[in-house]
């Protein structure tokens, strides 16, 4: 089966681009450049998607063929839940990106933004039988908040969507076993901070394990970390993402084009 989604472009004639879509495009393009800056890119693969406000269940996804460093607001593809491109573009949609992301956008009303990565330490933890350890600063914050989904290949079969959403439930941090990491949120900022925390937990876990025996945290300390972490607090999420966006603006603001 091809990794290119075989749907015909069905551009909506005279489809207006309102302010909400313009804002979403800039924000999502910024996220792609932030991922590139952090080294979370993977050639032309992996995806970040963002639902465009409105009743139509349309969302933006990266053009399959562009590196994250090349993505701009205007180059993003607008597609529906069937994977149809709603604006003219020479770029196709990646099938796996559509399957994984549309599953969450369709089933989880709060999943406005979905992010997926194949970082080295993220994939390493995804390959471990016991998964994410709670015995570090970041892992403790996520205790009880991480969902797991078993490996089913490259995620190109539509039938996987139901199993994926069932396994994820309402947990915003996800480990795709033997595959990679995934996070979602009410907006780009929440999804980003969730994924960043999960990524840091994986980084520390792999680094600590390579150095020797890990000093375990007590259940009480882990529970306290969960209570005090403020995971998902809107102001924190917004401030973090705004700071990262300023860094990207200072490096190369062309993503806004």
Indicate where each model-derived feature is located.
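Glycine-rich flexible loops
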Residues: 1-257
